[in-house]
UniProtKB/Swiss-Prot annotation:
Superkingdom as given in the UniProt entry: Bacteria
Principal localisation: cytoplasm
GO cellular component terms, semicolon-separated: cytoplasm; endopeptidase Clp complex
Subunit structure and binding partners: Fourteen ClpP subunits assemble into 2 heptameric rings which stack back to back to give a disk-like structure with a central cavity, resembling the structure of eukaryotic proteasomes.
Species, as recorded: Pelotomaculum thermopropionicum (strain DSM 13744 / JCM 10971 / SI)
HAMAP family per the UniProt record, alphabetical: ClpP
This protein's name: ATP-dependent Clp protease proteolytic subunit
Sorted UniProt keywords: Cytoplasm, Hydrolase, Protease, Serine protease
Lineage: Bacteria, Bacillati, Bacillota, Clostridia, Eubacteriales
């Protein structure tokens, strides 16, 4: 069962009840708390587009606690982050693994953060396919192409050479928040909100 807390707010018109995510959205906060799939991506994209329409100059705060997920769904979020005029600040809480680490790195320069005990994981894309040999070959070429462009994106956002990214993503590469800062995935480790 998935419980969502309700927040009650006093206004000049009386009480108003919001689910917690709607209340956070009023403060331009988007929360990714779980695997990235098409449904999650669509919700996050819709929230980003809404907040940009409300005020394209104001920051969007994107909190991430995710094990990663479907690359195409993650890329839809990534493209939207780059597309909207509002700067997207990223904040890692808990973990940003796989596709989620790329989203963390894709935040606006100078506005990519992590809490001190979060962990960050980068690696190459995973995939599995079965079927005819020709179809397997097609999918193998696609996952190799995907690995290349994901490495290029990570290189662009971290400032690391593509060769280092390719080496480091060959296997699971875990980082602490401080290590992620040194790597260029984030800009700052926060203990307390400023």
């Amino acid at each position: 069962m998935n419980l969502v807390p309700i927040v009650v707010e006093q206004t000049n018109r009386g009480e108003r009840a919001y689910d917690i995510y709607s209340r956070l959205l009023k403060d331009r906060i988007i929360f990714l708390g779980g695997p990235i799939d098409d449904n999650t991506a669509n919700l996050i994209i819709a929230q980003m587009l809404f907040l940009e329409a409300e005020d394209p100059e104001k920051d969007i705060q994107f909190y991430i606690n995710s094990p990663g997920g479907v690359v195409t769904a993650g890329m839809a979020i990534y493209d939207t982050m780059q597309y909207v005029r509002s700067p997207v600040a990223t904040i890692c809480i808990g973990q940003a693994a796989s596709m989620a680490s790329l989203l963390l790195a894709a935040g606006a320069k100078g506005k990519r953060y992590s809490l001190p005990y979060a962990r960050i994981l980068i690696h190459q894309p995973l995939g599995g396919v079965q079927g005819q040999a020709t179809d397997i070959e097609i999918h193998a070429k696609e996952i190799l192409r995907m690995r290349q462009f994901l490495n290029e994106i990570l290189s662009r956002h971290t400032g690391q050479p593509i060769e280092k990214i390719a080496r480091d993503t060959e296997r699971d590469y875990f980082m602490s928040a401080q290590e992620a800062k040194e790597y260029g995935i984030i800009d700052e480790v926060y203990d307390v909100r400023k």
